[in-house]
Amino acid sequence: MPSFDIVSKVDMQEVDNAVNQAVKEIGQRYDFKGSKSEVTLEKDAIKILADDDFRLKAIVDILQSKFIKRGISPKALQYGKAETASGGMVRQIITVQQGISKEKGKEVVAVIKDTKLKVQGQIQDDQVRVTGKNRDDLQEAIRTLKGKDLGIELQFVNFRD
């Protein structure tokens, strides 16, 4: 029985490269001269520390442009609230999403059921497995999911006949 898996994974090496490029650009930009702003990557979270809201927004813009250049979807990032830190600084934490949460998995399965195709979706940990009788239905399910905006970046892997 043909099947495929739907996953939401981000290459952490590319995230590291994008953060390093952003740090380099921040160090070279004129509007950040004398600033104590910093960007650090900790496991699956990016911590931004900036002097004020203006610089925080500028750093987030730099990070987004670097992520897009490195082929990482902006949907893979979850932005925390900007909060004040010690010394009058502003802090924001950006989480890199790995895997599909249970709620998003339920949304994906609901979208698949709404297509009225002869395919079934089942949630397995941080991925969704879709099985069906024929390959064309599975490809139609992929097309439908690509057309929907579920708020996360989806990849389709392990297509088996």
Swiss-Prot record:
GO CC, one annotated term: cytosol
InterPro entries for this protein: DUF520, UPF0234-like_C, UPF0234_N, YajQ-like_sf
One annotated GO molecular function: nucleotide binding
UniProt xrefs under Pfam families: DUF520 (PF04461)
Coiled-coil intervals: none
Keywords: Nucleotide-binding
Recorded family membership: Belongs to the YajQ family.
Function text: Nucleotide-binding protein.
NCBIfam families to which the protein is assigned, alphabetical: PRK05412.1
Name by which UniProt lists this protein: Nucleotide-binding protein Gmet_3206
Source organism of the structure: Geobacter metallireducens (strain ATCC 53774 / DSM 7210 / GS-15)
Lineage of producing organism: Bacteria, Pseudomonadati, Thermodesulfobacteriota, Desulfuromonadia, Geobacterales
